[in-house]
């Protein structure tokens, strides 16, 4: 694709600068791409066929957040795929967006208000929400600006914010429809409650942490006086009451029963009897339920239905009263004894334990390790709390009027993976997805926050609820129901993940039946970390399929999490986070220390974090540029594994960018100003070899993208550019340009520029900035761009392997030449010859091959001359055997040292021969191994045997 336009960001008359400076290139080219509309949907390489849609949705980052290493990794993968498919000719759509991030954003703004000694309650809801919008406008563009720094070729006119009017409309429509279908309901349920934020918290946002606690053993006296039981040893024992063990003695104030196992013979005769609830003026019954473990403790537990999830289910089964004894901020309420009312939960624990001991109800206290649930946002210990909440029914069959009648939204989501409409990469994540959906509970979607999508439900004065798209519609429903008077809107907001789950279809205009919705749903692939498979991936599948009948995406590529070099999770509290922009632009040590120690939840950690930072980064972090960071991320992208990020890898890929830059300068110096059009010219075996290797690279890159093996893509590009093109072909090309005929020089110059141009297109999805800058110069010489025309590598056809260009003969010839060069270099190394010391080489073997290779050997092995002879002279000079050739350096040698070297080589060859004979003498190997493998082993044996014969001959010539 070429655009005629006057503005060209490259000075075509200016030579390529001596060094690669990424900062200037990156800013210039990103703005230019966006201005030209290359990122827009419908913009693609013309292939002559109807372009297929290729769609990726951003996992929307928090609007108030900043870029972290996970974003950098995720964006590299997504943008690499989008750029690749754009160059393939697909109609690419890369949809950017940000999430309003209810809890996270509200916490940030509340902290700002706290610093001013103002609470959100002082402001009131309306003013507080205005403050949040102000904060969003101030900071919301930060993360999208950082995403642009990474080169994300997103369709920015489609950018959304999950609280935008169009997105909010889709949220309300989904809620109303699900409610009308009986799949959203309101009920009093036990939920995880954050007493600091005063909101319900998703089960998935609970972090369980092992802590050292205590187990309190408490006596509950029988109302009827002591009772006799037969213990597990058959002894008759008289009990004053039942003893239970608990880690939370303060919750006993809300006990509704004691419970034993129905088959426990010790207590069967006690079922239905009453016990006194210590410290409280009431009695509770002894009941039986299968969930009790008769072998744990005394085999008796207390049932506190309103403050324990297991107890809640048991209480419902047995109609035990649910007594709430905590206020929403975790203080004892009016349902507790007066002496404890108003106490904070941990103060209440101390007071309850002291009173139990004083009244001789406390039997004993033991140390006990326990799992403590904490909110992942605040770190506060969560409280099971019985509250009115809104839920999505996950297992209820959908009614006849829906797209999947008779099936629950969970069932439909499971089927989509089972029948292959959605595929996970790697496959094992499908098992995790299935396990979670098969054990799912109804989803609590209400949050007691002020920032978010307010639930579209209104209440009349007598408590009737009207769920509607607007207050006007709710009023109409109320009038139709004969309800007069004002309506009050539900103050709660929706779980952030509810609106995020609608992104696959609301971003394309749903609930309207838009052309975009029909064309771009489903997305091609979702790229995500495994940590949000449950939060986001499964919920997108459920809601997209229920509301539209389509899967949200065809593939789910699940990548690992970025950790530090020691494998530790990156977190602000550990002080081991890295800001990707700091890797792009660089940061000095003092700036890095300030960044890592600012705003810590625990300021006492600052000293240790500063010390560690100064030790790890004594010189700060150098500027690597975006391309080096992207190449690093791609090279790390193995399927599903966590990534231990090492800064040295960035340094290595920055060196790669420098290598590519310098190689391009060399190629341009040797090709600019030469007429390279047409098909004339003579291709050497080296020219044909590098073109043949290019076909293998193109095939490997295509496989890598298809299999989501970005590490293979990156490694293949690295090996070809560094090892084959730069280290070998450029050196061979120098010889051909200096010593070849005009036809050979033309063939070499053409090969140099054409292969480089193809490499720049191949590498563009991974390293877009440097490839664009270099391609502008290279394409002019390669005939891919005309002077003055505006074009971009980003919309050039992606190279595809051509089997006709594979040349096995040329590959074998260069492999032989490489072996000879390396053999002579090894001889030079063993002789401690300096690079400046050029010595003659005498070569015995196939005359045509050695004569052809002679000029290359002389240049690459730093030889003064190469003489091809029928037989090597009898001289005490070092010799290397390479296939059918014997190569002698014509220098004075230390005979003893050369004998030792040959003895070592003889021992190595004898070892290889013994191994090969062992394999071929093993009947099992010969019978079971593929025929090609057996033949390969025979060929190896023959080669080693022939080489050993020649080396022994050389050893004999040298004598003792």
Curated annotation (Swiss-Prot):
Keywords carried by this UniProt record: Aminoacyl-tRNA synthetase, ATP-binding, Coiled coil, Cytoplasm, Ligase, Nucleotide-binding, Protein biosynthesis
GO biological process, one term: valyl-tRNA aminoacylation
Primary subcellular site in the record, as a coarse category: cytoplasm
Binding residues for ATP: 572
Motif ('HIGH' region): 61-71
Catalytic activity: tRNA(Val) + L-valine + ATP = L-valyl-tRNA(Val) + AMP + diphosphate
InterPro entries: aa-tRNA-synth_I_CS, aa-tRNA-synth_Ia, Anticodon_Ia_Val, M/V/L/I-tRNA-synth_anticd-bd, Rossmann-like_a/b/a_fold, tRNA-bd_arm, tRNAsynth_Ia_anticodon-bd, Val-tRNA_synth_C_sf
SUPFAM superfamilies: Anticodon-binding domain of a subclass of class I aminoacyl-tRNA synthetases (SSF47323), Nucleotidylyl transferase (SSF52374), tRNA-binding arm (SSF46589), ValRS/IleRS/LeuRS editing domain (SSF50677)
Localization: Cytoplasm
Family statement: Belongs to the class-I aminoacyl-tRNA synthetase family. ValS type 1 subfamily.
This protein's name: Valine--tRNA ligase
Coiled coil region boundaries: 893-955
Recorded domain comment: ValRS has two distinct active sites: one for aminoacylation and one for editing. The misactivated threonine is translocated from the active site to the editing site. The C-terminal coiled-coil domain is crucial for aminoacylation activity.
Enzyme Commission code: 6.1.1.9
Gene Ontology MF: a single term: valine-tRNA ligase activity
Enzyme class, spelled out: ligase
Function: Catalyzes the attachment of valine to tRNA(Val). As ValRS can inadvertently accommodate and process structurally similar amino acids such as threonine, to avoid such errors, it has a 'posttransfer' editing activity that hydrolyzes mischarged Thr-tRNA(Val) in a tRNA-dependent manner.
SUBUNIT field: Monomer.
Cellular compartments per GO CC: cytosol
Organism: Bordetella parapertussis (strain 12822 / ATCC BAA-587 / NCTC 13253)
Placement of sequence motif 'KMSKS' region: 569-573
